[in-house]
A protein has these predicted regions:
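N-terminal Rossmann-like NAD(P)+-binding domain of SDR-like oxidoreductases, especially those catalyzing
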Residues: 1-166
Length: 166
């Protein structure tokens, strides 16, 4: 039986590469799109008919929970985010809802409805602030200096908290 993966944010650059990779490895892939996104998704058009496409929104717990209940994925990848640091200053509430609280909605949906699933939460170097990338490692202190980096720091820490608690 094929492994099942749920990719939240499948139409993003990284999400589409991941969907390609997992499909090639024989996974049954479900990728999400937001209803408010463009009607064309050039990054994943070549996968239409090969992967399942569902609508979900990180602002809406029920849309995520519905997919976890329906597909019972072995692996859940949250690639979605408001991922432009400069824009995070103009949209701090939206950035926090999508990039900080949205991942908690994913974690909670998995905890409540399919706790066997493994969760991958995408992160960014922005959690480290103005550090030189060559000098960073797993022990480097978080020092985010914009709303996007702070939101992703929260998501990272909540993912660790859920992993250690559940």
């Amino acid at each position: 039986m094929a492994k099942k993966a749920l990719i939240i944010g499948a139409s993003s650059q990284d999400g589409s590469y991941l969907a390609d990779l997992l499909h090639e490895k024989g996974y049954e892939v479900t990728g999400t799109l937001r209803r408010s996104t463009n009607y064309t998704h050039p990054n994943i058009e070549h996968l239409y008919g090969k992967i399942n496409i569902e609508f979900a929104d990180l602002l809406d717990f029920e849309s995520i929970a519905r997919l976890v209940r329906k597909h019972k994925p072995d692996e859940v990848y949250n690639i979605a985010a408001q991922s432009v640091p400069a824009d995070s200053w103009n949209m701090p509430f939206y950035t926090a809802e999508i990039s900080a609280i949205g991942p908690v909605r994913v974690l909670e949906a998995v905890r409540q409805f399919h706790p066997e699933a493994k969760v991958y939460q995408a992160t960014t170097r922005e959690i480290l602030g103005n550090i030189e990338a060559e000098s960073a490692n797993e022990d480097t202190r978080f020092d985010a200096n914009n709303p996007y980096g702070i939101a992703k720091s929260y998501a990272h820490m909540m993912t660790r908290c859920y992993r250690e608690s559940y």
